[in-house]
Amino acid sequence: MRHGMHHRGPMMGPMMDPRSRLFMALANDQRLKILTLLKEGEKSTAEILEALQLDPSVVSRHLTLLRNVGLIQARKEGVSQRYTVADERIFEMIRLASAIIKDWLDKHLEFFE
């Protein structure tokens, strides 16, 4: 096993640049789906599981990672957790990333027309 890696990908240790940690957290389709769900408002773990149709342990890992980088927060309600977005500015960041990608594609796809 290479230094700094484990079987699930790169480690997000405390020495990593916080910006890298944030971008790594966003670099996953399922975590982006979770954020999109939470844009609609607070969701329970069960609602997130139902929407994603993934193994609960996988969803739990995604939620933990998103919490650890400060993108979402959780509160206990009875025996379940309810999740919300911690900072709405993340959606502006995602929108900007989408605009950059669209501009790049528009520029490069004109060569194939």
Model-predicted regions and their roles:
Residues E50, R67-N68:
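Alpha-helical residues within the helix-turn-helix
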Residues G13, D17-V58, E77-R89:
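N-terminal helix-turn-helix DNA-binding core of bacterial DNA-binding proteins
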Residues E42-K43, R67, S98-I101:
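Residue-level detector of secondary-structure transition/capping positions
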